[in-house]
Amino acid sequence: MNIIEGKLQLIGDERIAIISSRFNHLITDRLVEGAKDCFVRHGGRDDLLDLVLVPGAYEIPFALQKILSQGEYDGICCLGAVIRGSTPHFDYVSAEATKGIANVTLKYGAPVTFGVLTTDSIEQAIERAGTKVGNKGFEAMASLIELINLYRKIGA
């Protein structure tokens, strides 16, 4: 059996965009820093990394569609933080952001990763933004790097 997988190393000429929501910026700023750290640690050039800021997680799919339609990036890392409150708003935003990102990704067939936190509390979000549970922004970028390499191997 042949195993085909992407490696966690960039060539150095990959152009990557991070789309991040500004809402809950105390969390998303940390996710962005984690993603940037991963990108550079694994061979990426800082001048080939762009940050696109949108108001909230709900707006990520719109920006993703616009960016992918231009065909200028090797991959996109989507980051955000949706924290449950006392109203059903959390359910709507997290569901639509998730579905929107998935639909756009499948439409364009491009390497995209999902690093949008959906947590029950601010404490859980903080834990996933670089404290107890690691940095999910770093992990989303690591997945993107592997996905870009896999995409190349399978002849996309």
Swiss-Prot record:
Reactions the enzyme catalyzes: (2S)-2-hydroxy-3-oxobutyl phosphate + 5-amino-6-(D-ribitylamino)uracil = 6,7-dimethyl-8-(1-D-ribityl)lumazine + phosphate + 2 H2O + H(+)
Keywords from the named record: Riboflavin biosynthesis, Transferase
Record-given protein name: 6,7-dimethyl-8-ribityllumazine synthase
Entry GO CC: cytosol; riboflavin synthase complex
CDD domains, A to Z: Lumazine_synthase-I
Task performed by this protein: Catalyzes the formation of 6,7-dimethyl-8-ribityllumazine by condensation of 5-amino-6-(D-ribitylamino)uracil with 3,4-dihydroxy-2-butanone 4-phosphate. This is the penultimate step in the biosynthesis of riboflavin.
Family stated for the protein in its record: Belongs to the DMRL synthase family.
Cross-referenced PANTHER family: 6,7-DIMETHYL-8-RIBITYLLUMAZINE SYNTHASE (PTHR21058:SF0), 6,7-DIMETHYL-8-RIBITYLLUMAZINE SYNTHASE DMRL SYNTHASE LUMAZINE SYNTHASE (PTHR21058)
Active site per database record: H89
Pathway it works in: Cofactor biosynthesis; riboflavin biosynthesis; riboflavin from 2-hydroxy-3-oxobutyl phosphate and 5-amino-6-(D-ribitylamino)uracil: step 1/2
GO BP annotations, alphabetical order: riboflavin biosynthetic process
Keyword Transferase: yes
